[in-house]
Amino acid sequence: MLCRRRRVGAAVRWLSRLAPPAPAEADPVVVRVDGSNVARLGKPKPGPRPRQLLSLPPFPGGGDGDPLPGRKAAAPRRVTAVSWVKHYLADVPQEVVQAHFNKRLVYSECSDHEVSVETIKSQKHHLKKIKHNDVMEPGMRIHLPVSVAEGEIKKRYETIPTATLHPNKDEIEYLRRLVIHKDSAILVLNKPPKVPMKGNLPVHNSMDVLAAAALSYGNEEGPKLVHRLDRESSGLLLFGRTKESFTRLHWLFTSVNLAKTNSQVWNAACEAYMQRYWALVIGTPKEREGIISAPLSKVLLDDGKAERVILAHPSGIDGAQEAVTAYRVMGPTIHGCSWIELRPLTGRKHQLRVHCAEALGTPIVGDYKYGWFVHQRWKQNPQPDFEPFTGEPYKLRRPEGLEIQKGSVLSKVPLLHLHCREMVIPNIAKFLSSNGEWHENGAPWSKEKPNLLRFIAPMPAHMKISWNIMSSYLV
């Protein structure tokens, strides 16, 4: 009985992150010869330690839980081993995780597999090597070397419900509180910062997956993203609830001319389409307002593992895309920063961030990808602020009762200050019947409905604090 307990204890220590204890018996004394040919007595050098493995929670599977309210039971989702590992090791570079799979250092263990005490003594009998594209099965557990983490591991166990990969009840309620408009054709919500737009399985806390699960409101299919915002930015986000509304609004956000039809009413509504962003930038543009027409192109970095958007070469031989942005300075320069209003006339990736940083020379506060060096100079060399009309200096003061939110302009590491505040779009529900039929001049029963919809989203907490701080100064 005592021998059996020792064997089980040894197996548990093998799977732990701690090294096994040193043997109780005394180590033999050996003779060592150093570089000076001097013989010394001492303990032998320690040999290689047994590989320490990190164990991830068992895979829950996606088809066992009850379907969400208003949704039909979905088929189990296909999740690969590399996706499951990347989800829990969010802070580890993807190439490090993939390298461990390539070296065949990742093992799998099925929880319902019967393993005897004698088998536990040799881990090779119930741990098998797996590939990155192997499909996870319910109850499967993954083991991989602790070295993959290279330090503290950020565990995200709380983001995955125990029995399903769908959002939990709290996430559904939180997302529905963000909705500011809902009709038969569209959904509009105020996206908070730091929420990704799209995520690969099993990462379910992205806007597309959350909305599809939580904002269906009884429809067989969830709403689909019409456009995108950057992960760090915030503001108005538009979803199409039907295939027809999603398609036509997606054309509108791509090009106004692409969305036009033979209907004068619909075309006039498309011409009125508009988006307005508010941003806090470092410095002040030379002109108070204007239009930026600077084509953009993408370049690949780190052997294709990352990409960056830059201003295109004037020759246009690098696959440039047209990008046009209208801007207006909203006030004086305070604390070395200025509030500006941005109107994108085209929809390119990182268009506003690149135009502010490279075309205007005033990167957005918190945009470390395109304004890292300007942020360094801004923090290290604070300059006095001057009233642009009188030329007199002034200083910041903190209003009474105002709490400094982490991420505001006075924070050591400010968050991105880019917010989609206003949006004007056609009232597409007026042109669609209940069965999805398109009416060029509007459905007969919807003549009293307006042709346009206008939405305004309040700023997130860190931008509100920055706004209040910068609007409170002494002359």
From Swiss-Prot:
It catalyses: a uridine in RNA = a pseudouridine in RNA. Pfam families: PseudoU_synth_2 (PF00849). The lineage of its organism: Eukaryota, Viridiplantae, Streptophyta, Embryophyta, Tracheophyta. PANTHER family: MITOCHONDRIAL RNA PSEUDOURIDINE SYNTHASE, RNA PSEUDOURIDINE SYNTHASE 3, MITOCHONDRIAL. Signal peptide: none annotated. Belongs to the pseudouridine synthase RluA family. This is RNA pseudouridine synthase 3, mitochondrial. Residues 1-15 form a transit peptide. It comes from Oryza sativa subsp. japonica. It is found in: Mitochondrion. One of its GO terms (biological process) is enzyme-directed rRNA pseudouridine synthesis. Coiled coil: none annotated. GO terms for molecular function: pseudouridine synthase activity; RNA binding. Residues 90-160 form the S4 RNA-binding domain. Its EC number is 5.4.99.-. SUPFAM superfamilies: Pseudouridine synthase.
